Amino acid sequence: MLASYASDPLKSRGRLYKEIPTSYRNEFERDRDRIIHTNAFRRLQYKTQVFINHEGDHYRNRLTHSLEVSTVARSVASTLNLSNDLAETIALAHDLGHTPFGHAGERALNECMREYNGFSHNAQSLKILTLLEKRYAAYNGVNLTWEVLEGIVKHNGPILGEINEYIAEYNKQNDLELSTYASAEAQIAALADDISYISHDLEDSIGAKIIDFHSLAELKYIDQHVVELKSKFKNISSSCLIYEVVRKLIHELITDLLWQTKENLNKEKITNIDEIRNLNYQIVDFTEKTNKNIKETKKFLHERVYKSNKITAISLKCTKIVQGLFKVYMDDINLLPVNWKMLIDSNETYSKARVVADYIAGMTDRFAIQEYNQLCSTSYITCF
């Protein structure tokens, strides 16, 4: 049974375009299925998480990451008697707006768009789901419920100060109450993302030999699991060791998140969802100690993995590809597919730049490489 402060699909604020409910799915399940059926969701399987897709079959990509986030989000929401369908749906959609080549691609595209209000993957997720996906005759986008769109836009907290152009534009027709916190389910999806990416980026980085178990000594709360497992299983293999460490880490983080969130709910005597939205802090959270550990882990990953020689070398090539594609399309808009070219308002530079950015952002790693080789490169790129 759902808690009184859960997002109840029977009490959803509905969709921008009215639709008749189905008898065999609730509204959030329906949204989940719509997201899974989008082209943007399928393309995630060929978009970088940390390692380029072709570097190894077992490294995570944006799709496998999103699936892992969704399982954590669903488990946490269920335990707290919240809507696991809503938490899962927001988690599945949270990375739809990412560019090819991970954060390197996003930084490069944001730099290209500096004169045109920049690029934000979060806003791009909203744009994909409300405009760019063309699956219905009656409207653009996939017409998701208010709660799912709110969660996608605000899962990292209220949007204050300068608001992204597309979010502001969309908000005029469908007010997402940007200055308040999102539902508890959306907050869960955001922290499930943290749990998944720090755990699995550590796993993939050890698999890629960018870091080793000795370097994990810098993270005492993780190293204690390494020491304990080596003591208990004398002949444990390195591959099995990292799986066990990650399993224990995920369990530890979820348990901590559940404990602190229950404490917050009891302390605030929360009885309805509006009380969650109107708090001055997020109700779903880790303990102070765990937040500190997570912050240290993110710093460790940034310095030891994302800035490593291997990742930096790849990132430079990815940046070159994204910037090269942006320039060549801006110089000759006729290189865009006809259906994309039709989206440009006359020959106005700003509109042209936004359409080019939307097109590049939707590319997979391999398609971006293919386009670059065909349109820009004098030296053929096959892999990094």
From Swiss-Prot:
- For this protein, what is any one GO molecular function term? dGTPase activity
Note the superkingdom of the native organism: Bacteria
What InterPro entries does UniProt report for this protein, alphabetically? dGTPase (IPR006261), dGTPase-like (IPR050135), dNTPase_2 (IPR023023), HD/PDEase_dom (IPR003607), HD_domain (IPR006674), PHydrolase_assoc_dom (IPR026875)
Specify the HD domain's residue ranges.
62-198
Ordered alphabetically, the record's keywords are:
Hydrolase
Which biological processes are named by the entry's GO terms?
A: dGTP catabolic process
Coiled-coil zones: none
Q: Which CDD domains match?
A: HDc
The family database entries (Pfam families) matched by this protein are listed as:
HD, HD_assoc
Which family is annotated? Belongs to the dGTPase family. Type 2 subfamily.
- NCBIfam families, sorted: dGTP_triPase, PRK01286.1-1, PRK01286.1-5
- The protein in question is named Deoxyguanosinetriphosphate triphosphohydrolase-like protein
